[in-house]
Amino acid sequence: MQQFLHSMKHYAIFFAVIAALTYVLTLVLGADKVDLDKYSTVTITKGDTLWELSNKYHNHHHLTTNEFVKWVEDVNDLNSDTAQSLSPGDKLYIPVLKKELHNQVAIEQ
């Protein structure tokens, strides 16, 4: 009987450790997720580049041009090659909060 309790104790500890690791990994991996519902999207037109978009929206974000480009590449799953071959009609998330653009449009009207 004592051996049974001893092995059950080991199983309980094992599953507790697995549960704790799963919880921690969920928190760590989920921390990098961006709530895209808060961010604006832009539709690419002919000749647009990520650097130009950064400059166009510079009053609406507080990133350097390189940080802006990196954010757009990461969130939209672009690499350097695909970022340079954007096509008209492509839609991209940009690091500009929707409410920032909405407030600016309201002020200008």
UniProtKB/Swiss-Prot annotation:
Transmembrane segments: none
Subcellular location(s) of the protein: Cytoplasm
Coiled-coil spans in chain: none
One of the record's GO cellular component terms: cytoplasm
Function: Inhibits cell division during the SOS response. Affects a later stage of the cell division protein assembly, after the assembly of the Z ring, by probably suppressing recruitment of FtsL and/or DivIC to the division machinery.
InterPro entries: Cell_div_suppressor_YneA, LysM_dom, LysM_dom_sf
Keywords: Cell cycle, Cell division, Cytoplasm, DNA damage, DNA repair, Septation, SOS response
Protein name in UniProt: Cell division suppressor protein YneA
Gene Ontology terms: biological process: division septum assembly; DNA repair; negative regulation of cell division; SOS response
Every LysM domain range: 40-94
Protein's UniProt keywords contain Repeat: no
UniProt xrefs under Gene3D superfamilies: LysM domain
Keyword Kinase: no
Family the UniProt entry places it in: Belongs to the YneA family.
Pfam families: LysM
Principal place of residence: cytoplasm
Organism domain of life: Bacteria
